């Protein structure tokens, strides 16, 4: 009622000014909507928090190439490794919220990093989920000469020999480390963690008998297993990996066990919803392309099309799990 009388008084006092103000307001809304609908009208930068040539970089480039072809603008990869991914994430959060700076991110940056470091941002408030584009699990591998031939035998041996089983990783807080820590925590095993500088180096440590077991990215370990250089005894995914169908899942030994990792696209919070939706829908179409499915399959990755709402559900669910895991693995940030 009050707003209606106020509007009538304004129009009566200066109808031309009131009409111009209304036209200007409608024009701004229309331009914003049209801009989002037309996106992209210029090149789009995809920030990747890893160095060139790694698994995340390769996956991001495969998708960027197809985004370019589908949307008619160049999607350019910008590698910004360092500081555990925070440098890249902060740069995207600071960028204009216009959809022209996106971030290709691993799930661990969302769910484990906040428990390890005192961050300048909150990924749950400062990032906008777009799409999870791929998921994968870890492959448990031991030396080919090891007497261990199954996950049950590994658990029993580690339990009978506390402190004598160690596992390698690419570094603290990475997927390799978390996979080993998750098994040790769940089964109450005393297993040592030995970090190396990279995934290949941590795999080589098992192949050369310097470390007992490795929880490896499928890209590295599947090729080694097929080449007879390492013995794969289990996978952490809920279903067997089609690339190595004879290797059982960890859940076949530990019912309900599922440790799956993912990577996908996010934008800075405040990016227009129409842009988020168009990007998500396009990524979903790309995920179903036969060539994309095969290329990711060859990397040991399942091509997925997980949309923003489900994306948010997943990270919220993982949040408490990784908080507990970070505490048990001694990864919690200083308080």
Residue ranges and their predicted role:
Residues 108-118, 182-186, 213-246:
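A ligand-binding cleft/hinge motif common to bilobed small-molecule-binding domains
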Residues 94-100, 115-201, 250, 255, ...:
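Hinge/capping helix and adjacent helix->loop/strand transition within the periplasmic-binding protein
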Residues 1-12:
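N-terminal secretory signal peptides that target proteins for export/translocation
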Residues 41-43, 185-189, 226, 273-335:
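An extracytoplasmic/periplasmic, membrane-proximal ligand-sensing/linker region
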Residues 17-30:
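Bacterial N-terminal signal peptides
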């Amino acid at each position: 009622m009050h707003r209606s009388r106020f509007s009538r008084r304004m129009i009566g006092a200066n109808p031309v000014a009131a009409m111009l103000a209304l036209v200007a307001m409608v024009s701004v809304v229309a331009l914003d909507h049209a801009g989002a609908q037309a996106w992209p009208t210029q090149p789009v930068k995809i920030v990747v928090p890893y160095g060139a040539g790694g698994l995340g970089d390769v996956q991001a480039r495969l998708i960027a190439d197809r985004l370019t072809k589908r949307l008619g603008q160049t999607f350019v990869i910008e590698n910004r490794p360092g500081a555990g991914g925070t440098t890249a994430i902060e740069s995207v959060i600071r960028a204009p919220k216009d959809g022209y700076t996106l971030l290709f991110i691993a799930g661990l940056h969302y769910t484990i990093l906040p428990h390890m470091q005192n961050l300048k941002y909150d990924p749950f408030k400062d990032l906008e989920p777009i799409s999870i584009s791929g998921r994968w699990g870890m492959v448990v591998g031991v030396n080919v000469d090891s007497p261990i031939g199954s996950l049950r035998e590994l658990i029993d041996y580690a339990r009978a020999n506390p402190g004598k089983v160690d596992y390698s990783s690419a570094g603290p807080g990475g997927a390799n480390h978390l996979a080993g820590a998750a098994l040790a925590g769940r089964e109450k095993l005393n297993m040592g963690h030995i970090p190396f500088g990279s995934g290949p180096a941590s795999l080589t440590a098992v192949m050369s008998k310097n470390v007992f077991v490795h929880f490896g990215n499928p890209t590295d370990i599947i090729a080694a297993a097929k080449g007879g250089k390492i013995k794969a005894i289990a996978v952490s995914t809920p279903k067997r990996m089609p690339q190595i169908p004879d290797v059982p899942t960890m859940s076949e030994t530990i019912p309900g066990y599922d440790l799956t990792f993912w990577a996908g696209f996010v934008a800075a919070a405040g990016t227009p919803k129409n842009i988020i939706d168009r990007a998500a829908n396009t990524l979903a179409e790309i995920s179903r392309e036969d060539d994309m499915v095969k290329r990711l399959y060859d990397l040991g990755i399942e091509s997925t099309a997980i949309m923003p709402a489900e994306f948010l559900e997943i990270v919220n669910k993982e949040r408490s799990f990784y908080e507990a895991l970070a505490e048990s693995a001694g990864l919690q940030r200083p308080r």
